[in-house]
């Protein structure tokens, strides 16, 4: 189950936390959440600085009502924070037991390699998964990212596998969402 701190301002994590408490045990499922986008106003409200990562993991764990995440995914690469700072902070979360594994999302293959190189060079935790935009309408990841992940034995977990709903209906059908969704209008029309 993948949620993110920013989805519905944390409500997705709260709903999942309640569902897990009522219907399953954390040991029976794999829980993943993402970090990057702003959760409040302020200079440290977003991104992948050490301060932002540490603040958001505590909030995520509180909302999920658990002591750890199985997989903590960076929602985007933060180009305003040094990669070394981000990778060290993520490694420290693993060392602290708050996170079992780390993953990445939505970056270029060369950026992903750079993150992995920095982690390996310093003996830190490396990413075990890559989540990029991929579906029957948008297949760019087949060019570089997928071959890289296969070679490095990194799990691939696509997002928007139904192209924001475009693959669930006849091509060209308009919905209220498709009229206003920037991602749909950018990638799938």
Show which residues each predicted segment covers:
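Glycine-centered flexible beta-alpha turn that most often forms the glycine-rich phosphate-binding loop
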Residues: 1, 69, 102
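Active-site mouth loops of central-metabolism enzymes
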Residues: 39-54, 75-81
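Short, acidic/polar
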Residues: 46-65, 112-117
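N-terminal binding-site loop/beta-alpha segment at the start of enzyme catalytic domains
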Residues: 2-30, 67, 95
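A short, structured active-site edge motif that brings together acidic residues
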Residues: 27-40, 130-132
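Active-site groove signature of glycoside hydrolases
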Residues: 61-82
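Beta/alpha (TIM)-barrel catalytic core signal, keyed to glycine-rich beta->alpha loops juxtaposed to Asp/Glu
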Residues: 83-189
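Active-site-proximal loop/turn and secondary-structure-junction residues that shape catalytic pockets
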Residues: 5-7, 35-37, 75-78, 106-108, ...
């Amino acid at each position: 189950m993948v949620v993110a701190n920013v989805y519905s301002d944390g409500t997705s994590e709260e709903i999942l936390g309640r569902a897990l408490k009522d219907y399953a045990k954390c040991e029976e499922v794999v829980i993943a959440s993402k970090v990057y986008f702003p959760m409040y106003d302020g200079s440290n409200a977003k991104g992948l600085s050490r301060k932002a990562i540490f603040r958001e993991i505590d909030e995520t764990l509180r909302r999920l009502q658990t002591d750890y995440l199985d997989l903590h995914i960076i929602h985007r690469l933060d180009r305003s924070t040094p990669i070394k700072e981000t990778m060290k902070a993520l490694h420290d979360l693993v060392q602290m037991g708050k996170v079992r594994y780390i993953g990445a999302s939505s970056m270029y293959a060369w950026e992903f390699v750079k993150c992995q190189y920095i982690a390996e060079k310093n003996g830190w935790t490396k990413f075990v998964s890559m989540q990029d935009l991929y579906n029957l309408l948008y297949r760019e990841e087949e060019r570089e990212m997928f071959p890289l992940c296969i070679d490095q034995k990194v799990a691939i977990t696509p997002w928007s596998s139904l192209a924001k709903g475009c693959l669930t209906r006849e091509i060209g059908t308009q919905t209220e969402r498709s009229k206003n969704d920037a991602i749909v209008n950018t990638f799938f029309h």
